[in-house]
Structures are given as C-alpha cells and as structure tokens.
A protein has these predicted regions:
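Extracytoplasmic small-molecule ligand-binding "clamshell" domains
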Residues: 23-97, 101, 177-180, 267-271
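Alpha-to-beta junction loops
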Residues: 61-62, 80-96, 145, 185-186, ...
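Short amphipathic alpha-helical coupling segments at ligand-binding clamshell hinges
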Residues: 47, 51, 241-264
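Acidic, polar ligand-binding/catalytic clefts
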Residues: 53, 65-141, 221-230
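Periplasmic-binding protein-like
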Residues: 33-36, 112-116, 124-125, 210-254, ...
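Ligand-binding clefts/hinges and TM-proximal coupling segments of bilobed small-molecule sensing domains
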Residues: 62, 150, 154-167, 251-280
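Bacterial N-terminal signal peptides
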Residues: 7-18
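Bilobed "Venus flytrap"/periplasmic-binding protein-like clamshell domains
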Residues: 34-37, 44-57, 117-181, 203-204
Length: 280
C-alpha cells in the first residue's frame, strides 16, 4: 500500500501543508548540483534526485531544477536568488545540507552518515574491519601507504592525530572545474595508482563501492564516532529562513517517509547511523 497521500492528508489536517503542499503551483523547484554523484546530476541518477522525485510525487508536483555547482556561492545563486521581475525565487529546497547549516533553515534530519576508509579491493588490506585497524598494520606496511584525503576534512585531522600526515595525498575540497567532484577525484587517483586508500564522506565511499561491485570489489570501512574528531553528521533539507509552513511540510513528509528514504540511501551503499550514532 502507498501510504504517501494518506500521511500527507494527515499533514494537511495538522496544518503543515497550506503554503506549498496545496499550492496551485504544479512544480517543486529544487536547488542542485548538475554533476555531483552520488548526490545529484542532470540525468537524475543521484539519491538526492530520487528523494526529490518521491517528495514531488507525494505533493502532486513535478520536479524542476536550478543547477549550480555545489561550492562557494551555491545558496546565493540558487535558494536565495530572486527574479526582480516576477518576485519568484529560483528554487525552494536544497535536498541535502548539514543539519543546523548556517546559510539556510533546516528541516529535521532525514539521515545520519559517517566518514569511511575506502580501498580498491587490496588483498593486503583485507584484514581491516575497522578504520583503527589501519593503525595496527605492521609499520613497514603502514608507512608505505598513500592515503587520499580532502583538505580540512575529519580525515585530515585523523591523519594528523596519528602522525600520518607525511603519507597524505591532499586534494582541495573544491575544484576549479565544475565537472570534477570528490567521487571522481578518488576514483581517478585510485585507478592511476596515486593513492592506496582514501578517507571520504560515507555516501561517497558507498557509491564508489557500488560502482565497482562488478569488478575488483571496493571495500568501505566506516569510522566509529569519536569524542575528539567528529566523523558523523546528520543531513537535512535546506529552505529559506522564515518559511515555516514549507519547513513544516517537509518535516512532516520526512517523518512519514523514513523507511522509503532509507531504502533509497541503502541502494547507494550509504553507511547509515541512528540518532544515537549506532549503525543501522
């Protein structure tokens, strides 16, 4: 049974949908990156695209995107961009932002994930069950590894804490080329033999493993929550400040569609945690 519309009817009863859910506007306008898998792309192949489609269907709308690379200026050029002639904003929701993000109001989180180690099925790393097992490798093996990491990330902090910075292969968090994204960087560098293992955001690690499942299977090893270095983050949807009714609409939808959302995320291999940071 499809519970989407009955649950949205309940949202209406509770007063959550008057501004957007019952609007005559037939379009759900989504702010998104055109080339940033596993999150989104123009072909609609990312999990954020899938979530947006589910949301639009339940609201009786179709999805329309405003595209801009996910980097500095993203919110200004999408969610906050207003047409002076029509008074309309370019788009009305960002599907994935950190909960509590300072540039937008945020819904309740719809997922929590964690950073992970990923390697391209190396036999000499098969013994790793946890990220900290990397530190237990024989010194002559450990100190030969080249570890890919993005500057300013928790992975960089972890390497610093464990005196492994000399082995780090650092990548900038943002590239000047909008066609380059973190997943493509790690995939290219791993294939070229420039790195042996990488520390990346969990959804990226899971996606890379899924993409290579038919060849040399990539291995994903999530970090454990750490009191000193934050590896896990809740992810929410971002809306404009002051649009309480729209935020309430999305909160209600998220509450009633957790199972569906988690199903989509699992298809992409996203490491998921519950509210207490325990693996799901």
């Amino acid at each position: 049974m499809n519970w989407g519309r009955p649950l949205l009817t309940l949202c209406v009863t509770l007063g959550a949908l008057p501004a957007f859910g019952q609007s005559p506007d037939p379009v759900l306008r989504v702010c998104s990156d055109p080339q940033n898998l596993p999150f989104s792309n123009r072909a609609g192949e990312g999990f954020e695209n899938r979530i947006a489609q589910e949301l639009a269907r339940d609201l009786g709308k179709t999805v329309e995107y405003t595209w801009f690379p996910q980097r500095m200026g993203f919110v200004r050029n999408t969610l906050r961009k207003k047409d002076d002639a029509t008074g309309k904003f370019a788009c009305d929701v960002i599907i994935g932002v950190p909960a509590g993000y300072e540039l937008t109001a945020t819904t309740k989180p719809y997922m929590r994930s964690i950073y992970a180690l990923v390697h391209a099925g190396r036999k000499d790393l098969d013994s790793l069950d946890t990220a900290d097992d990397l530190l237990k490798l024989p010194p002559e093996q450990l100190h030969k590894l080249r570890i890919g990491v993005f500057a300013g990330s928790p992975g960089a902090d972890w390497l610093l804490r464990n005196q492994l910075l000399e082995q780090a292969v650092n990548f900038p968090r943002q590239s000047g080329d909008p066609a380059v994204n973190p997943a493509s960087v790690i995939e290219h560098e791993m294939a070229a033999g420039n790195i042996d293992v990488a520390i990346v955001w969990g959804p990226i690690a899971g996606y890379l493993a899924r993409e290579h499942s038919s060849s040399a299977a990539w291995h994903v090893i999530p970090f454990s929550p750490d009191p000193q270095i934050r590896f896990d983050y809740p992810i929410a949807m971002g809306v404009r400040f002051g649009e309480k009714e729209w935020k309430d609409t999305l909160d209600c939808w998220i509450d009633s569609h957790q199972e569906k959302i988690q199903g989509i995320l699992r298809e992409y291999g996203v490491p998921l945690l519950d509210e207490t940071a325990k693996p799901l």
